[in-house]
Amino acid sequence: NPDRMWEFSAKHKVEILGISPTLIRVLSTMGDDLPKKHDLSSLRAFASTGEPWNPAPWYWLFEKVGNSKLPIINYSGGTEISGGILMGNPLLPQKAGSFSAPCPGIDADILGEDGASLPAGEVGELAIRKPWIGMARGFWEENERYLETYWSRFEKIWVHGDFAMKDAD
C-alpha cells in the first residue's frame, strides 16, 4: 500500500519521519495526492540516511510534502562508528542532498590519494582524523580485519569507505 506511511504518520501524529531516498524516489512517482489527503501537520522534520539523494525526489519531499518548510536532516554514519560522521542542521539553509557539517565531536575530512585534505569541488575519501566518543577498537574477535579495513589507508586516520565532496558554500 503506497499510502501506508502517510496514513501511519497522520494517525500517530509522527513528528520526525525517518525515510530513505529510495522510498521517496518511488513515492514521488505516485503523485502528490497520497500525502496531501492526510493531516501531516504534526511533522516537524524528515530524517534521512543510508544512501545519497538526487535532487528531484529531495525537492518533491521538501516542497510537496514538507510545504517548503520542513527540514530534511541528511545523516551519514555507520554502526562501526557508533553514530554519525556528517549531518544536516535544521537551523541552516537546506541544500538538496547535502550535509551541513560534521556531527559534533567528529573531525571529518575529505582526503585525496595522498591523504591530504581536498578543496571544495573535488571528490575524495570520507575520513575522520581524530578519535571520537564511541569509537570502536575492533571487530569482535577480528581486530586485524578492523585495522585493515579502516586504518590501513593513511597513518592514524580512520577511513569510512565512502566518497564525498565539499561544496563551495
Predicted features and spans:
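Conserved ATP-binding/catalytic segment of the ANL
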Residues: P119-G121, A127-D169
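ATP-dependent adenylate-forming carboxylate-activation enzymes
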Residues: N1-F8
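Short coil-to-beta-strand transition motifs
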Residues: A101-G105, W158
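Alpha-helix/helix-capping structural signal
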Residues: T22-R25, E51, P131-G134
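Short, P/G- and charge-enriched loop/turn segments at secondary-structure junctions
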Residues: L92-S98, T149-Y150
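Gly/Ser/Thr-rich phosphate-binding loop
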Residues: W6, V14-I19, S28-Q94, D107, ...
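Hydrophobic beta-strand positions
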Residues: D109-I110, M165
